[in-house]
Design a protein with these regions (language model features):
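A short, hydrophobic beta-strand-centered structural micro-motif
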Residues: 41-56
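Charged, amphipathic alpha-helical segments and their flanking helix caps
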Residues: 1-31, 36, 52-177
Length: 177
């Protein structure tokens, strides 16, 4: 389910933001270490990542179904040739979007959405600045926006193993969304 939710968030943001950003990506540590200089060339852009499961509560009296609460984080980044404030507020040029506008657009596109999945509606969480700094001629700004949702997972009976059904020559999938 986690992969399906992350892909649905990426697709909704890609469709909704359109040419406002250069792309919507899965986050894989691009802001860590020396990769930052390369990532800045993609700004304005958005990254989506699964931030973790924060709770699993039994949903039935037999404790065979659990409501799982998961968090997803959307990173928005932009740069401006000028001050650090310009990277947040945007500028006069079409490509000078600004991280504040990106944050507003991402929240508008995601809050209260299920994206056609069997999940709870996305709830907004914290929004925080990851960093704002001057890099040579450009100023950059990156913010993280948290979203929460829930879904249900069924537990196997004690001692049981998943038993996939196989028809014909189709490969059995034990673990699937």
């Amino acid at each position: 389910m986690i992969a399906s939710i992350e892909q649905a968030i990426k697709q909704r943001l890609s469709d909704g933001l359109g040419q406002m950003v250069s792309g919507v990506h899965t986050y894989g540590g691009e802001f860590d270490g020396e990769g930052l200089a390369q990532v800045v060339n993609q700004f304005p852009a958005v990254w989506v990542m699964f931030a973790g499961i924060t709770d699993s509560e039994p949903h039935d009296t037999r404790r065979t179904r659990y409501q799982v609460t998961g968090h997803f984080t959307v990173l928005v980044g932009d740069r401006a040739s000028g001050s650090e404030a310009d990277s947040r507020f945007g500028g006069l040029h079409r490509n000078d979007v600004g991280t504040y506008r990106l944050m507003q657009a991402v929240r508008l596109l995601l809050i209260n959405q299920t994206m056609g999945l069997c999940i709870g509606r996305l709830k907004p969480g914290k929004a925080k600045s990851l960093f704002s700094k001057q890099m040579e001629l450009d100023a950059i700004s990156v913010f993280a926006l948290d979203f929460e949702t829930h879904w249900f997972e069924d537990a196997l009976r004690d001692g049981d193993w998943p038993r996939p059904t196989v028809s014909g020559e189709q490969q059995a999938q034990v673990y699937a969304d």
